[in-house]
Amino acid sequence: MLWVEAHQTPCLGICRGLQWMNVFLGGTLHPHLPDELGTHMHRAGSPTHSRDTTHSVSTISDQFGMDLSTTSVVVSHHHQGIDALAPGLTTWAVAPDGLIEGVRRTDTLKFPFYTGVQWHPERSAAGQPLVDQVGLHFLRCARMQRGKLASR
């Protein structure tokens, strides 16, 4: 995270990565979602034998060229989540229970791609708008960053 801050490189935080982004910038986490939210929506199974589950995630702001309220079904597997959002981050996607599922830096000029998602895009079905668009925008920003570094 220190490297990303110093060099303003593209950063995609997945699951715990989103949680690290939030805590690094001063936010807090729910320590155990079933106790806090009263739901097992985000991780199926028992505490000793958990497994992936799926649920919907919807955008609450325009992001990555997607319209407001774009929804995808994503793979989820976590028992912690954002409680207090860090200063400098903004929420762009949420689960039906209100848990924050997508964040980005507020300063998109300094950090063109500093985005975290609580779900697992690498295990979610292709063709889901949030999954596809997050990946495509990350790759686009990474290629632009590589071009900037190569021209130095």
What do these predicted ranges mean?
Residues P31:
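Acidic/charged, solvent-exposed loop-and-adjacent secondary-structure segments enriched in E/D, K/R, S/T
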Residues M1-H7, P34-R152:
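Amide-donor transfer/coupling interface in amidating biosynthetic enzymes
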Residues L2-T28:
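Catalytic nucleophile loop
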